[in-house]
Every structure is written in structure tokens, then in C-alpha cells.
Amino acid sequence: MAKNVIVVGTQWGDEGKGKIVDWLTDHAKGVVRFQGGHNAGHTLVVGEQVYKLNLVPSGIVRDGVECYIGNGVVLDIHHLLSEIAELEKGGIDVRSRLKISPGCPLILPYHSAIDKARECAKSEDKKIGTTGKGIGPTYEDKVSRRGLRVYDLFNPERFAEKLKEVLEYHNFVLTQYFKAPAVDFQTVYDQAMADAEQIKPLVTDVSAALYAANKAGSNLLFEGAQGTLLDIDHGTYPFVTSSNCVAGQASAGAGIGPGMLHYVLGITKAYCTRVGGGPFPSELDIETEGAPGYQMSQVGREFGTVTGRKRRCGWFDAAALRRSGRINGLTGLCITKLDVLDGLKELNICTGYKLDGKIIDLLPIGADEVVRCEPIYETMPGWTDTTFGVKRWEDLPVNAQSYLNRLEVLCEVPIAIVSTGPERDETILKQHPFK
């Protein structure tokens, strides 16, 4: 009988999901993206080769694994084709194994133009830190029922008709409100039609394909992007992404019933990071040499895969993780980047907050309350021996084991996996999600 696993980020993204998805794919016949777009950045290290993926599911680097892009993903086809070309240069067979839902909303040039113009117009304290890829405006078009989808590409006359209508609206906003240049209809149309010819062989009823694979007994892995605290409904709104990043979205964003989902693995760093604006209760100074935040930033190489921006760093926030655990219904946790904490004399864990004179043990909903939270810390001793590359639990320093055990208790979720480095075999397994 098939067993299907969802991998989700439990923080503000960048938790190391790509490596874990790649590692778990050894037990899966298919890997599915179900939300987000090319604002996601997954880095995989396989031997000497480093792969940086935005849209193509991480399972593509495993021979014989089918990869699916579900209807919940917003798709920049031009970017996808570039990504495919890069993978093919490295000798990876992509086109025979990649399947794209015809229901994916299309990201077109006017979406990124709106995205960038809108962010530029905001004051510094209101900036979300968008990647400028057009993700948000594409989701807006989807819910306002004016967006174009992959299936529209294959009816050129109807595509042109819809494009003229939506472009008239967006160009009015660009030129009249943002005082930005208009986007040319013919340029957008010609590029879309050229891309359509290349993408057509990959378009498949993904929902039906996943149902058939599950019925045939194939294990499936659902690969989340971003993180729970960036979720449009459950994150630190409005400093969030434009999609649902939680486990429940795997069902809607891939077109499968929730009864087909069996295990939810939450990925979290051994500390916290965040890119862009928004509240971050346990944030540390990352600029002062020798400070814990500086070590996290430098040793952890905390720079965004997509934007290259410095990530903000802070202590592990168990109160935030507790919220993520409940929203996602986590079955198990995977802790990544434990080695980044090697050498710190003491480690703090945020166990709750002081908010308006009260003590709470769960991250509040919405940015307005989160920004007023003062972290409450529990201090634990650090360790001097390295954890990098350790492959057995018993070989971890005693204090590292104690730290992880405490996280497990505070988060109310058992630890299934500990990642101790970027390579596939730099992994400690306590409970296999597929077994």
C-alpha cells in the first residue's frame, strides 16, 4: 500500500527542505510541488554538483522519479524552461519525467512589473521584501477570476482576447497609479505562444496522474515551498507570501483528497531565520563579530537562494514552532543546520512571550500582535565538539542531544530526522516517514 508524505517548512522558509526532499525521494516514485512559484529556492548538493531549483521539484535529480507541478503553483513558463535547460546541461533527463497541471495560473511580465512598482512605492516600514517575481499579483488575478492559466495557451485566439482585457487593466494601474511604463501586448503574446509550443508535451492532468500512481501503490512526496509563518492565512500577515504554505494546501494544490496524505514532516532549523520585513521576536544582531547572531549568519551562510539578501537570524522559537505544529498536524520534525550552533557557550530557546502584560506560549496571529511580543528565554549549555557530518544520534555531543530533546518536548512533536550537513549521507534518522 502506498504511503504519501508531505514536507513543509515550519518557520519563515529557508529551512533546508530541498535536501530533505531529495533524501526522502529514495523511497518515493513521485515528487509534487503544490504551491508557490519561482520565489522558492531549493539548494541540493549531490557529490560535487550543486543544484539550485525554483520550480522543478527536487526529486528531479533522482533517476526514474516522476515530478509533478500541481495546480496550486503559479507558473512563469519562461523561467521554467530556463531551469529545465540548466538541468539538461548537467545531464539530467527532465522532460520525460516532468508533468505540469493545465490549471496552473500563469505569471506574465505585467505581474512582475506590478510587483516591483508596488514595492518601490511603499515606505521602508511597509515593505514586505517581495522577490519581485510577480507571485502576489498572479494570485490576485487568480482569485479575482481574471487570470490566465496554462490551458489558455493552447487556444491562441481566446488567449489573445483574455490577455488584451487583463493587460488593459494592469497597464492602467502601472501608468496612472504607479507612473511606471506600460507592458506591450505583442511582446507578451509572442513570448507566451513561443513558450506554449515547448511546454505543451509536459502538460498533464496531474490530479488524475497522482490518483493513478497512488492506486498503483507508488509512494508520493509532496514538497512545500516557503514556510508556515509566511502562509497567507496563518503567517505574520501582511508580511507573508500570497499562497497557503501549510500541509492542508497539498490536497487543494495538487488535486488529491486529504485521505491520500499520511505523514506530515515539518522542517526547521536549529535556530531561526527570516528574509525581508516583518516581526521576528527572537531576532539577534548579525553584524557584530563574535555575537551568536553573527555566527549563525556567517557559519550558516544565511543568504537567500533567490534574492541573495542577508537573512535575519535569531534563537529557536518554540512558541512559533508550537503554532506551526498544530496548524500542520505535524507527525514528525526534521532539525537542520545543527552544526551552525557548534562552539556557542550557551543557547537560548524562546519558550513564550510577554504580550501586553500577559505571558503566552503560542505565537499570536497577525503581525500587529507579534511585533509587540517580548521573548521569554530558557538557557541551555552549548557544546564544543563538532556535529557536522555526524550520522548517528549517539555520536552527537551530550549537550547537543539535550538541546534536541528539549526542542522535541517544547514543540510537542517527535524529532524524526536531524540533518548535520548538506550531503545526502550527513543525516541522522530516528524515524523514517515512509516506514
UniProtKB/Swiss-Prot annotation:
Disulfide bond sites: none
Ligand binding (GTP): 13-19, 41-43, 311, 337-339, 419-421
Listed EC numbers: 6.3.4.4
Gene that encodes the chain: purA
Keywords: Cytoplasm, GTP-binding, Ligase, Magnesium, Metal-binding, Nucleotide-binding, Purine biosynthesis
Name of the protein in its database record: Adenylosuccinate synthetase
GO molecular function, one term: adenylosuccinate synthase activity
Active-site residues, Swiss-Prot/TrEMBL: D14, H42
Species this protein is from: Dechloromonas aromatica (strain RCB)
Pfam families: Adenylsucc_synt
Residues engaged in binding IMP: D14, E15, G16, K17, N39, A40, G41, H42, T131, R145, Q226, T241, R309
Recorded family membership: Belongs to the adenylosuccinate synthetase family.
Reaction catalyzed: IMP + L-aspartate + GTP = N(6)-(1,2-dicarboxyethyl)-AMP + GDP + phosphate + 2 H(+)
